[in-house]
Amino acid sequence: MELKKYQLQVIKDLDRFLELLIEKQNISKAYNALWNEKGINVGIDGMPPYNPELAGVPQVCFKVPTGGGKTFLAANSLKPIFASMPHIHPKAVVWLVPSDAILSQTYKTLTDKNHDYRKKIDVDFGNKVEIYSKQQLLNGQNFNPTSVSDNLSIFVLSYDSFRTSKKDGRKAYQENGSLLPFVRFKQDSGTL
């Protein structure tokens, strides 16, 4: 499966944003510079200003119509994102979807080693990829500091995974002995 022309342009824009981010060492300045290079103002008469919802975490949004290949774009975005980051960090992705219906479909797709999306990710990361559901994470199933250090770890979650109005959603906030090895991992390596 190959990227379409407009998808290739999206990935090129992502690459350029990441270059500008490294150059400017400031997310908002990189965002403004990218749009300025395209001749588009940022502010009242152009693109909205960068919204730093998570301080220090670059937020990238691809606006693509239904059927436009958002999941394939996301799969193709992982390599450029991690290539631009220092190699000392574990490679971890929260693949957040809007609903539980899309969650099961996305999880099935990403765990199917014969699916084009998974094939792309496997090629880009040398087949060192682990896909986790919320339940696997909470149970510590194949999820440990060594796995996180050695592989690209993709956590497929939905917004519902964190909703506290549902009993299942509250489990993400409970203390969990299955995740205890990460405390020492964090203290030893300072990487999380």
What positions do the PLM features span?
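RecA-like P-loop NTPase motor core of helicase/translocase proteins
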Residues: M1-L192
